[in-house]
Amino acid sequence: MPKYKQRRRKLKAKAKRMSKKKEAAVVSPKLLTPSPPLPEPERVVTSAADIPQSRNWLRPSWNLRFPNIKDAINLWTNRAWCIYSCCQTCVAQSLEVLKDALFPSRVYHRELHSLKQQLCVLKRELCKLRENLKSISENSSCSSCCHKCCPSDKLTTVPACAPTTNGESQTVLSSTQPQPANHPPSPPPLPPPPPPPPPLPPPPPPLAPLLLRKSGTTKALQVEPLKKDGPMHITVKDLLNVKLKKTQSVDERKKLVPSPPEERTPLVTVSDLQHVTLKPNSRVSATRIKNVLITPGKSQIDLRKLLRKVQVERSPGGTPLNNKENMDTGTGLTPVMTRALRRKFQLAHPQSPTQSLPLSTSSFDEQN
């Protein structure tokens, strides 16, 4: 059903189009009748309301205005050229940056070139300054020469009796000078060379040391008699007879002058004490060395080998029976002195027959 409807619609539209074409073909010969010639043909744009419905399909073709082809071409070429120049500048800048990164010497070359240009500019300015200075010096020298020459000219041209002013003198000078003929002007005279610089002052003579020489001049000097009334006079003879003493140098004075208490350094420092090594100073008697048994291979000494048995009266339990009051320790005294003191004491205090000295004392004295 829908296909049938679509086909009907298409046929109706086709019939309408055919009828419109027939109507347009009938109307067109009437409209194409020759019109009277116009003086200036002008394109008139008519509105859509004035155009009949049969000619509506011709309206778009009549109203189209084609632009100028040259303007369009110029516009597109300008745009393309701008894009090309921008791309070229970007590529050139990127290439320059890449070259500077790969070859850093190029940066130094550019800096050198800029420095050379600055030096050239400075040289030009210096040359200009020198030329200006030369011109100023030449002008000053010329003016000085003119000032020197003008008074002599005035004296020759103007009589002395007639005083004249500056204006009159100038007119007289101009009248006396012969007017040049109609000749080409002569070139200006060359400027005189600049005056030489003034000579440098001579250096001062070296100061000679004052030496008192014993020459004939001193002999010629007569010693003037001393005036008792006036002040005391010092003669040359007194100066020659003066004897000078050697003075101490600054270093010697510093050595002699004691240093202040704040700057004094300690005589013995901690480092000196740390570097000190003490030596053993034990002197053992020969008798004890003989009795002592020294084992060379062992570091620890066995005290049992150093002790020896002594004949001492012992109790049944084994303790020695010694009279401690009569024993001499020998501290601070030599054995000879202890024996002498003991004899003296015995003579002063005789012992009773019951008391008897133990045998240990004699053995102790013999040991000492």
UniProtKB/Swiss-Prot annotation:
A GO CC term assigned to this protein in UniProt: nucleus
Compositionally biased tracts (Basic residues)? 1-20
GO BP annotations listed:
regulation of cell cycle
Tree of life domain: Eukaryota
Where composition is biased (Pro residues), the residues are 181-208
Q: Which UniProt keywords apply?
A: Cytoplasm, Phosphoprotein, Ubl conjugation
Spans of biased composition, class Low complexity? 350-368
Q: What is its main location?
A: cytoplasm
The free-text function statement in the UniProt record for this protein reads:
Plays a critical role in cell cycle progression.
| Cellular compartments annotated | Cytoplasm
| Name of the protein | Proline-rich protein 11
Where do the record's region annotations for Disordered lie? 1-41, 166-208, 347-368
Motif position, KEN box: 324-326
Entry-annotated residues carrying Phosphoserine: 299, 352
According to the UniProt entry, where does the motif Phosphodegron sit in this chain?
Answer: 293-299, 333-338
Summarize the PTM comment.
Ubiquitinated. Rapidly degraded by the proteasome; degradation may involve FBXW7-specific phosphorylated phosphodegron motifs.
